[in-house]
Every structure is written in structure tokens, then in C-alpha cells.
């Protein structure tokens, strides 16, 4: 009789397990929209010199870039800049609209926004004794 009660209890618990586990929602990744592959479209740099200087660079045959943000926190990049190719990996993390990208010994801090399929990164640098301050606005389009 003890074995029957034990088996009955086990059977009831076993029937309830699939029902409860299917109710649990998958974990939510806060920056889901950032994940995937992004292709470079344009870069605008505004330098705060004696006279404000604005430089705009558009994607062309000599300037191609893709970024791939992964859930693991890895970022992969492929860059062709004036015919010079560079690719590799780094680390990224985001907090609200702030984004940090670390590649080798370089760390880039900025803000990001995503509007439909356009990723906009804004990177600001304060003026120092040797360099003028600047703001760079980089736009990417989602590839997949």
C-alpha cells in the first residue's frame, strides 16, 4: 500500500510538471533590438574648433563596416576603411541607452537609439588642452 501511495503521489506530481513549466515565460533580454548584424550607412563628426567643423562620411566601396551584437556580450566587426581591412571581436554592454564597446585596448562610450531598422550611435569627446571636443553620430541599418 505504501508503494501505491508513493507511486500515486509521483504520478500526480509528474502530471503537474509539464503544465507549470510551460507557463513560465522565457527570460527577457533588455536590449533584444540591438542584437544582430548592422551595416554602416553614414558618420557625421562635428568638431568644436575655433569654427565648428562638420565632416560627413557615407558608405561607399572604400568604406564598409558591419557590427554584430551577440547575446553573450561579444561584438564582431568587419571594417574596410579607405581600402584597409580590419576585423575582430570585442565586448559590449548596454545600460538603458548607454553603450560601451571594448576592443583590444580601446574603450568607446556612447549612447544609442534604434528607430525601426536604423541604429544611431552618438559618441562625444570633451575638449582637452591638445584636442578639440567633438561629437560623432554613426548610423547603421539592420541587415538581419
Model regions and ranges:
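Bacterial Sec-dependent N-terminal signal peptides
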Residues: 1-27
Amino acid at each position: 500500500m505504501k508503494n501505491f501511495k508513493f507511486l500515486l503521489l509521483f504520478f500526480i506530481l509528474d502530471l503537474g510538471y509539464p503544465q507549470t513549466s510551460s507557463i513560465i515565460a522565457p527570460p527577457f533580454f533588455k536590449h533584444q533590438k540591438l542584437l544582430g548584424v548592422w551595416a554602416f550607412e553614414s558618420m557625421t563628426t562635428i568638431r568644436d574648433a575655433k569654427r565648428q567643423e562638420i565632416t560627413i562620411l557615407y558608405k561607399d566601396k572604400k568604406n564598409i563596416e558591419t557590427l554584430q551584437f551577440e547575446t553573450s556580450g561579444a561584438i564582431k566587426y568587419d571594417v574596410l576603411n579607405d581600402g584597409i581591412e580590419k576585423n575582430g571581436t570585442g565586448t559590449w554592454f548596454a545600460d538603458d541607452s548607454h553603450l560601451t564597446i571594448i576592443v583590444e585596448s580601446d574603450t568607446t562610450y556612447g549612447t544609442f537609439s534604434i528607430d525601426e531598422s536604423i541604429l544611431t550611435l552618438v559618441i562625444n569627446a570633451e575638449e582637452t588642452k591638445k584636442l578639440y571636443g567633438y561629437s560623432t553620430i554613426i548610423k547603421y541599418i539592420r541587415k538581419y
